[in-house]
């Protein structure tokens, strides 16, 4: 750093310190470094996008006015994320080298998130198997498990692993044709191809790749033309010994309205699940996030978050950021008491009534003046069958139980019966106002304390 620039910045910091609380200064300003100064602009590095956003919204004028107080000139302040600087330097230094090919051509512009690598993935008991399977596929594409099918709830790391596979393969072979796409984008591109009479172009795009990663594959269920097209794409790639990686929120056998021929192909390779992280993994995730974002958070605060937020990684990390922001806005240190205040609304929602299949059966049978035994019986009269279907629908929506387990709890029924009930109620809800009211009433009884 230029000596004059350092001197200017040190004097500026003294002024800013006098204007802010110690907590706010340490949280938002201390980690900043001046990069360069021109005739009108001062560029300042910041550790992450969250800090950049806060500085832009709340502290830019303070920084500009503090600098003006030192040198009698008003500069335009530009906050730049440090990682972006490194990326630009790496691109510049390797400009004569062959750049990473993460797409087949410009039209297929699918981006792998640079943050989602194996190195940044936190391994725990809940995801160890899925991580090991993903790494095995990345090390030996189309030789280990093909396809690899990763499933689990929202925000548990499925997308992270898929991007990590793509990065790992490209690091070893920059010329590999790696394509990552959501099932929604795949469907939309197919629709456009049909509309514009470009079917052949669409097929060439997805069948001439080395690695195809499709996220949230469950959303092609019910879309006949998309399933037809993907069936042939799958066959073409598999026959050519190309790697296919799919993710979903549930295993293939539990995806309703998925064609059997696709279901069987999804089960050809390896199916790996990701569960909700345990306490130790949640703590490790929070510590990793704090390190990456350059946040100073005590272990007891992270322990509090890990104890209260158990559902998924996104909510865990979101809770940490919320606490840091709350600390800055209230000019208070990050403590367990402050964390309790910052998360009280979130936690109160999380601590609502725990919904189980037994509870659903009790509430539904009471609502329709039936006995729980009726819902479990083999009776098929409408006054019993329809409430039973509603109870199965709610069991699928409000619990984490698998379809076979739900069927078992309703008199030992097959999982296909549960799928039928779920699909029927889902479809009827679109047009039946009375059913909507019934389901809403029962849901309130189930979820409210």
From Swiss-Prot:
One BP annotation, GO: regulation of DNA replication
Region (Domain I, interacts with DnaA modulators): 1-73
UniProt-annotated location(s): Cytoplasm
Disulfide bonds: none
GO molecular function per UniProt: ATP binding; ATP hydrolysis activity; DNA replication origin binding; lipid binding
Pfam families (alphabetical): Bac_DnaA (PF00308), Bac_DnaA_C (PF08299), DnaA_N (PF11638)
Ranges in a coiled coil: none
SMART domains: AAA, Bac_DnaA_C
InterPro entries the record matches: AAA+_ATPase, Chromosome_initiator_DnaA, Chromosome_initiator_DnaA-like, Chromosome_initiator_DnaA_CS, DnaA_C, DnaA_dom, DnaA_N_dom, DnaA_N_sf
Transmembrane segments: none
Family designation: Belongs to the DnaA family.
Quaternary structure annotation from Swiss-Prot or TrEMBL: Oligomerizes as a right-handed, spiral filament on DNA at oriC.
UniProt name for this protein: Chromosomal replication initiator protein DnaA
Organism: Clostridium beijerinckii (strain ATCC 51743 / NCIMB 8052)
Species classification: Bacteria, Bacillati, Bacillota, Clostridia, Eubacteriales
Gene for this chain: dnaA
